[in-house]
Amino acid sequence: MKKSLFAALFGAFLFCGMLSAGETPAISIFGDSYSTFEGSIPQGNAIWYFNPPKNNNDVTKVEQTWWHQAIALLGGRLEKNESYSGSTICNTGYNKKDFSKISFLARQGRLGKPDMILICGATNDSWAGAPIGEYKYSNWTAQDLYSFRPALAKLFSDLKQNYPGAEIYFILNSQLSAAINESVHTVCTHYNIPCIDLKN
């Protein structure tokens, strides 16, 4: 994970001029494997970054995670880290399994009382080959939410409704499918949610 790049992007791009001096924003992290760290996410959520490490990755302590560095640069505090390794935004997971209990949609109500929400998702939707679906911004059916586009729209709608005072940002990983990239940009624009595209 591009930890230094993430931190630089957040420091330069997100919070500049947003807060008054002395404010400490409550920041919630909403993600998948790249946003996990053992001891920092709810018990029972699947973990990718363990303490001590198990997966031969280069993250060995929480201070190395992108989100910890970002929060530090923003002068904030962690409100909640609701991240779950392998989770998809929509309710379709790997091998077409039903992920409706662990998807971003299922977990969006667990973010506490944040001033800012940083969402890092869609990677597993791309890698799992989840159905893309059609753009739909209201009247979602249960079946709609097994496809990426309507699920992302429903997710943003729920977040806006449940956290009306929070600034919301979406971080889009690099090397995802063109359909996922296009979908994220389109739905972010519809809901006026800034999207930060990672490179390389």
Per-segment meaning from a language model:
Residues 1-5:
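Positively charged n-region of N-terminal signal peptides that target proteins for export
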